[in-house]
Amino acid sequence: MKITLLAVGTKMPRWVDEAYADYAKRLPREVQLELKEIKPEKRGGGVTAEKGIAAEHARLMAALPPRAKLVVLDERGRNWTTMQLADNLKGWLADGQDIAIVIGGADGTAAELKSRADILLQLSAMTLPHGMVRVLLAEQVYRAVSILNGHPYHRE
């Protein structure tokens, strides 16, 4: 199974890249976590939030892996526990289905992308920095896989 994390934004602080890479490399061979950075649209100079979202949407659509289950992060999405993530991951692994998880830009994601999503997922009711979201997702994927493999990383 391949999980592709499509994140609008580039040039993250080194600690973000290092923490993300650490969790990604801990995963077993049957679960690959790949990061695809999507160039954000510059704002200002007549580029409205709507135009920026549209440009980022086009880039995201071009980068989406074909036939992958689409999970889009959204503040109005479902709020899963780690165990719910593990349960869903178990089903996706059994189906052999690849996953694409989208972290939108500063102004969010296009309504079209949200309507196309198989799952809208909320990580927190709080606003989180994009770099932190990358690390949090990588850690939660690792934790969910650890649960499925009976590894003692997660404690109930």
Swiss-Prot record:
EC class of the enzyme, as a word = transferase
| Cellular compartments per GO CC | cytoplasm
Coiled-coil stretches are none
Which superkingdom? Bacteria
Keyword field contains Cytoplasm: yes
Binding locations of S-adenosyl-L-methionine = L73, G104, L123, S124, A125, M126, T127, L128
- UniProt keyword annotations, A-Z: Cytoplasm, Methyltransferase, rRNA processing, S-adenosyl-L-methionine, Transferase
- Similarity comment: Belongs to the RNA methyltransferase RlmH family.
**Name used for this protein in its record:** Ribosomal RNA large subunit methyltransferase H
Species per Swiss-Prot/TrEMBL record? Laribacter hongkongensis (strain HLHK9)
Q: Which gene encodes it?
A: rlmH
